A protein has these predicted regions:
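Phosphate/dinucleotide-binding and metal-coordinating scaffold of catalytic cores
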Residues: 1-171
C-alpha cells in the first residue's frame, strides 16, 4: 500500500508505505493467519532485532468480503527497521558482496529478482532483492550460491549441524 501522505494506520508509526499480508497458503485463512500471528509474536519474544508491527484486519473491498489479512510495516533498510550497511549497486569486489542484503523469497515472479531452480525444475524459488537495487553478475552469482546452499542445508540431512555455521542466531 502506498499512500499519498504519511498516515498512522491502526496505531502504527506514520508512514506512506504499508503491506497487506495475505494468508495465501490457506483457503479459509485461519491456519495461515495463526502461523503468521505466532511467527510475529515469537520473533518479538525471542528478541529479534527487528519485527515489523502487524495488526490483523478483515478486508472488505467494494462491499465484498475479501478475507483476513495483516496490515504490516513495510520492511526496508532504516536505522529503526533493518539496520544494515547497504551494498553499492553493481558491486564487483568480492570482499564487499558478503553482507548488506535485503531479500525476500516470494511465490511470484516480480522484478527485480533472481530465479533459483533446483532438482531439474522440481521447484522454482524467486528471490526479490530490495537492496542493492541493481546487481552485478558477481552479486547475482553470490546471492544465488548462498540461497541455494541454505536451501539444501534446510531441507537436507536433518542430523547435520552444518546449517548452524551459517546462521547468526545472536544477530
Amino acid at each position: 500500500i502506498k499512500l499519498a501522505d504519511k498516515q498512522a494506520l491502526m496505531g502504527m508509526k506514520k508512514s506512506k508505505h504499508y503491506t497487506l499480508l495475505a494468508h495465501a497458503d490457506d483457503s479459509n485463512n485461519r491456519k495461515g493467519f495463526m502461523r503468521n500471528a505466532v511467527g510475529f509474536e515469537l520473533s518479538k519474544m525471542i528478541g529479534m532485532t527487528y519485527t515489523p508491527n502487524a495488526k490483523p484486519l478483515e478486508l472488505v473491498l467494494n462491499g465484498d468480503y475479501v478475507g483476513l489479512y495483516f496490515l504490516t510495516e513495510n520492511i526496508r533498510v532504516d536505522k529503526d527497521r533493518v539496520n544494515i550497511v547497504e551494498q553499492e549497486d553493481e558491486e564487483t569486489d568480492s570482499e564487499k558482496i558478503t553482507g548488506g542484503w535485503l531479500v525476500e523469497i516470494d511465490n511470484y515472479d516480480t522484478d527485480p529478482h533472481i530465479t533459483i531452480t533446483e532438482g531439474g525444475d522440481v521447484y522454482t524459488m524467486w528471490v526479490t532483492y530490495k537492496t542493492p537495487g541493481v546487481l552485478s553478475s558477481q552479486q547475482e552469482a553470490y546471492l544465488t550460491q548462498q540461497i541455494t546452499m541454505l536451501d539444501k542445508l534446510i531441507y537436507g540431512d536433518k542430523n547435520s549441524d552444518e546449517l548452524w555455521q551459517y546462521l547468526d542466531m545472536d544477530a
